[in-house]
């Protein structure tokens, strides 16, 4: 997001002060939140894929919820742990580095090599014992709606909650934005890869798609949000 007015205000407020700031720019954040979040794609997909497996069984094929254009677009994921560790690195630089870092903007993501949904979707689905497939030619090449599927099968999700003793309030809550998965996975139809050269000059860490997404799903499972 581009908060230009906020950045201008921070520059004005920090001028001549002992404190400074750093502008951190991730792409889609891959992580865990305990109490719902309007932009938490891992939670939306975890609910969808858990329920999909419950209804269709292990080994079922899951069509990508987007289109052929978004399926092949280049992008970078930004896992919450990498973002956090970068922020720690940026805010604990030595005194001689501080002037070089203060007020700077940094793209922050998991890998300098961009990926695609065609590479990520099968990995994400495999966590749930499912097979991720490319967009279908049916329905104009547009894939299914994850949050719509969960809403339509709400009673079956409630069965899962009861059977596995899960936390409630994840389906139909007022904090999660149902259109976010479609926005990210269907409407983003252009390459948007990030240049991480500047980030890696200050702090270098790379995380695979599997490690980033599986860690988020593990945390949802440990919190009893998914079975």
Predicted feature locations:
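Substrate-positioning beta->alpha
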Residues: 2-5, 68-94, 100, 104-107
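Glycine-rich "substrate-gating" loop/helix at the edge of Rossmann-like oxidoreductase active sites
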Residues: 27-42, 66-81
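A short C-terminal helix-loop "cap" of Rossmann-like NAD(P)-dependent dehydrogenase/epimerase domains
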Residues: 29, 45-68, 131
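Active-site loop of classical SDR/Rossmann-like NAD(P)-dependent oxidoreductases
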Residues: 183-196, 211-213
């Amino acid at each position: 997001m581009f908060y230009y007015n906020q950045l201008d205000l921070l520059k004005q407020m920090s001028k001549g002060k002992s404190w400074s700031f750093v502008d951190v720019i991730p792409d889609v954040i891959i992580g865990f939140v305990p109490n719902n979040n309007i932009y938490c794609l891992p939670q939306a997909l975890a609910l969808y894929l858990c329920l999909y497996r419950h209804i269709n069984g292990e080994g079922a094929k899951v069509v990508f919820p987007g289109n052929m254009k978004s399926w092949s677009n280049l992008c970078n994921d930004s896992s919450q742990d990498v973002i956090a560790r970068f922020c720690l690195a940026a805010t604990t630089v030595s005194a001689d580095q501080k002037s070089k870092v203060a007020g700077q903007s940094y793209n922050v993501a998991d890998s300098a090599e961009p990926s695609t949904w065609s590479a990520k979707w099968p990995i994400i689905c495999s966590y749930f014992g499912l097979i991720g497939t490319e967009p279908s030619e049916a329905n104009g090449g547009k894939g299914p709606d994850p949050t719509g599927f969960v809403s339509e099968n709400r009673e079956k999700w409630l069965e899962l909650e009861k059977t596995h003793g899960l936390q409630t309030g994840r389906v139909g809550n007022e904090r999660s934005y149902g259109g976010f998965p479609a926005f990210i996975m269907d409407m983003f139809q252009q390459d948007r890869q990030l240049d991480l050269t500047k980030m890696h000059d200050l702090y270098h860490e790379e995380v695979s798609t599997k490690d980033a997404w599986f860690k988020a799903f593990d945390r949802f499972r440990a919190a009893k949000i998914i079975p």
